[in-house]
UniProtKB/Swiss-Prot annotation:
Lineage: Bacteria, Bacillati, Actinomycetota, Actinomycetes, Mycobacteriales
Keyword set, alphabetical order: FAD, Flavoprotein, Oxidoreductase
Record keyword Flavoprotein present: yes
Superkingdom: Bacteria
Enzyme Commission number, as recorded: 1.1.-.-
Protein name: Uncharacterized GMC-type oxidoreductase Rv0492c
Required co-factors: FAD
InterPro entries recorded: FAD/NAD-bd_sf, GMC_OxRdtase_N, GMC_OxRtase_C
Membrane spanning stretches: none
Protein family: Belongs to the GMC oxidoreductase family.
Coiled coil: none
Length: 629
């Protein structure tokens, strides 16, 4: 009975695999395909796992309803036609099919290339050993711990706060929902297991909307700095002045913030990507920009000793990417801070208008309290609002609103010769030509091998042909500055992100896509892939421009890596849940120091912005806490 149940559960997945990657044409055998994809799907949260399986079952049923036969019993060409017919029903259905395709191709591709990926991970010695950290498992932590200050979150913001407070002589405890990873794990762990383990929701978090936006966020000691690209741009002076002048955020004054940006850059050891490790993907972008007369340059990154293995997104296997788990956190621990891992903070403890600590939950469901007079929340823009609401501190009407995502899109170009986009730095070079004028930042970007296959069009034979040509593909992406139109809410204890992209940002995306198309053709691409469902490869710039003009913007593939603004800091009590010093309004003893306090989109990768603002909030916290001791 159990075997029959297992077969019944796996059949819709095997059926989809037979249509997507037909084994008769060189795709994986059904059992192999199911094993590969199940390895990832079983790691998804229950709601995501249910949605995937329901979608697969719906596709299997649709084959019966439209042809009278199951997908595996059809000819491979007919299977592909069935998927095309289903996807053509509506933009929403097409997006759902593309979402299933993306999940399946990520899992299958990562396993296909696992041997190469792990071989490259082990090709060189580690650039540096793991840092000395005082990490205590929540299971080993007492039920009650006392400290001067507790920091919720160990990412870019939390790490800088912890270092500042500890160096000021305060007894600091940092609580982290995820766990500590070691460089040896990054060198030896299967890529799917790294991806599923390092990201919140196994990397399947999505902002609901039209279109939906994929929203990966790290969950580990070191936060998203463990899995980001390492790109370190300063916010422009115009952005800093906007925060100061429009929001009354004195902490963002360029003179003050500039010094803290210097500190963040020095902590991270930021430097431009060397050409010798950039990889051909980045060099093609620079060459194309030069031929068009556009401003472009290697990207500044925090990766001293990087060899260009393109695995930043699943944990650097050489410890070259210098996330805060390798600098600010060990510096905080050297000054006396402690980190408790596997501890999800459920609520802030407070009475009579003053906080006195936090309550966290261990994986086994038991709780632990950290009692402290100062609570600094650095859980990130999607998690901080929910924590404050669960704590009874979410009364401000703008909390959870004003969400900006800095949405990103991508085009791929086919070249006559090999590019091997994944042999080099994951995010290596940037075009700045449209940044000030249109809010569009273009970057040469790739993924670990096999994990970016969702850019390829079609199903069946067409898709397999593109997968075979993966080494000849270059990928350029763009992010557009957006307004804070999204929201973060809690539904039955789960975070729900909603983001409907505004018309102004759709116009920016069109500018971005046309500019990327020009770059790819200038670089020598013979065909350009848009990722728009049903759109064929483009062989000329006018053809691409025509397709982009006619395309439904709701069918664009969007991702976002930079959520900000959900607890904006500023002088206006009606507009900003957090005041101009970083203190949460309505309660004493609570500060916020993460991406949620950035009052508008920073218009660049936000790591430096978050760290510099966190330093500013930390200084305010020290002045307040030390002043009353």
């Amino acid at each position: 009975m159990s075997r029959l149940a297992d077969r019944a559960k796996s059949y819709p997945l095997a059926s989809f695999g037979a249509a997507l990657l037909p084994p008769e044409l060189g795709g994986p055998l059904p059992a192999q395909f199911v094993q590969r994809v199940d390895r990832y799907v079983t790691r998804l949260p229950a709601t995501s796992r249910f949605a995937v399986r329901a979608g697969l079952a719906s596709l299997a049923a649709a084959s019966y309803l439209t042809t009278g036969r199951s997908l595996p019993r059809l000819h491979p060409d007919e299977r592909a036609r069935v998927l095309h017919r289903i996807a053509a029903l509506s933009p929403e259905v097409a997006a759902a099919v593309e979402g299933l395709k993306a999940i399946v191709l990520l899992a299958n591709g990562a396993d296909t290339y696992a041997h190469e990926l792990l071989a490259r991970a082990q090709e060189h010695d580690a650039a540096r050993p793991d840092a000395e950290l005082t990490v205590i498992l929540s299971a080993d932590s007492p039920s009650v711990t006392r400290a001067d200050a507790v920091v919720v979150g160990s990412g870019a913001g939390g790490a800088m706060v912890a270092r500042t407070l500890a160096r000021a002589g305060l007894d600091v405890v940092v609580l982290e929902e995820g766990r500590r990873w070691t460089v040896e794990e990054f060198r030896s762990t299967h890529p799917v297991d790294r991806y599923a383990g390092l990201y919140r929701g196994a990397g399947a978090t999505v902002a609901l909307g039209r279109p939906a936006v994929v929203l990966p966020m790290g969950r580990a000691v070191g936060g998203t700095t463990v899995v980001n690209s390492g790109t370190c741009f300063r916010p422009s002076l115009a952005v800093q002045r906007r925060w100061r002048d429009e929001f009354g955020l004195g902490l963002a004054d360029p003179d003050q913030l500039g010094r803290r940006l210097d500190d963040a850059e020095q902590t991270l050891r930021v430097a431009p990507v060397p050409l010798e490790i950039m990889g051909r993907n980045g060099r093609l972008l620079l060459q194309a920009a030069k031929s068009l007369g556009w401003r472009a340059a290697p990207i500044p990154r925090n990766a001293p000793g990087c060899r260009g293995c393109c695995q930043c997104a699943i944990g650097c296997p050489s410890n070259a990417k210098f996330g805060v788990h390798l600098n600010a956190l060990p510096q905080a621990c050297a000054a006396g801070a402690r980190i408790i891992s596997w501890a999800r903070v459920e609520r802030i403890l407070h009475r009579a208008g003053r906080a006195y600590g936090v309550r966290a939950r261990r994986p086994d469901g038991t709780t632990l309290d950290v009692l402290a007079d100062a609570v600094v929340v650095a859980a990130g823009a999607t998690e901080t609002p929910g924590l404050l609401r669960r704590s009874g501190l979410g009364g401000h009407p703008r909390l959870g609103h004003n969400l900006a995502l800095h949405p990103a899109t991508m085009l791929a170009g086919l070249f006559d010769d090999d590019v091997f986009a994944w042999r080099g730095v994951l995010q290596s070079a940037a075009v700045h030509e449209f940044h000030e004028s249109d809010g569009v930042l273009i970057e040469a970007t790739s993924t670990p091998p096999g994990m970016g296959s969702m850019v390829f069009p079609g199903y069946g034979a067409e898709l397999l042909r593109w997968l075979d040509r993966a080494p000849q593909i270059a990928t350029f992406g763009a992010m557009v500055a957006d307004r804070g139109v999204g929201t973060v809410r809690s539904v039955r204890g789960e975070t729900v992100v909603r983001y409907d992209i505004a018309p102004g940002e759709i116009a920016k995306l069109r500018v971005a896509l046309q500019a990327i198309g020009r770059l790819l053709f200038a670089a020598g691409a013979v065909e350009v892939l848009t990722g728009i469902p049903g759109a064929p490869p483009m062989r000329s710039l006018p053809e691409l421009q025509d397709v982009l003009r006619r395309a439904n913007p709701r069918s664009l593939h969007l991702a976002a890596f930079h959520p900000t603004g959900t607890a904006a800091a500023g002088a206006d009590e009606q507009l900003c849940p957090v005041d101009a010093t970083g203190r949460l309004r309505g309660v004493e003893g609570v500060w916020v120091a993460d991406a949620s306090i950035l009052p508008s989109c920073p218009e660049v990768n936000p790591q430096l912005s978050i760290m510099a603002m966190a330093l500013a909030v930390a200084d305010q916290t020290v002045a307040k806490v030390v002043g009353v001791r």
